[in-house]
């Protein structure tokens, strides 16, 4: 069997991992084996947290809408149910923006609900 020389390939692979690990503390940024484990874990966390961020923002929007609606004596679930019945299509993000930055517009929306 012929000899396979892969010094350049191996060096490039290790450099890539160590570059991704720069900024980690201690051996996690210097030793390849430890750095490789930490990079894999960090990438896994990054992937999971990109999806978690979507859940967190939705929860934040719902909390803001609920707080503003309760000031006017209405719960979040009743508000969303009424909007759906009246075919008022506003997503939670824009509703929460209205609730925070444009109270008058939010109150107008609440007035349309019987």
UniProtKB/Swiss-Prot annotation:
It is found in: Plastid, Cyanelle. Pfam families: Ribosomal_L20 (PF00453). One of its GO terms (biological process) is translation. Keywords: Cyanelle, Plastid, Ribonucleoprotein, Ribosomal protein, RNA-binding, rRNA-binding. GO terms for molecular function: rRNA binding; structural constituent of ribosome. One of its GO terms (cellular component) is cyanelle. SUPFAM superfamilies: Ribosomal protein L20. The keyword Ribosomal protein applies. Binds directly to 23S ribosomal RNA and is necessary for the in vitro assembly process of the 50S ribosomal subunit. It is not involved in the protein synthesizing functions of that subunit. Belongs to the bacterial ribosomal protein bL20 family. This is Large ribosomal subunit protein bL20c. It comes from Cyanophora paradoxa. The gene is rpl20.
């Amino acid at each position: 069997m012929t000899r396979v020389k892969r010094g350049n390939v191996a060096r490039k692979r290790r450099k890539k991992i160590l570059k991704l690990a720069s900024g980690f503390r201690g051996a996690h940024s210097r030793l390849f084996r430890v750095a490789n484990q930490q990079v894999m874990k960090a990438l896994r966390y990054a992937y999971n947290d990109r999806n978690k961020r979507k859940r967190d923002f939705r929860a934040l929007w719902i909390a803001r809408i609920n707080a503003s609606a309760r000031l006017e004596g209405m719960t979040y679930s009743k508000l969303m149910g009424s909007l759906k019945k009246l075919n008022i299509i506003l997503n939670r993000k824009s509703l929460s923006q209205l609730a925070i930055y444009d109270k008058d517009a939010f109150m107008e929306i609440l007035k349309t609900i019987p």
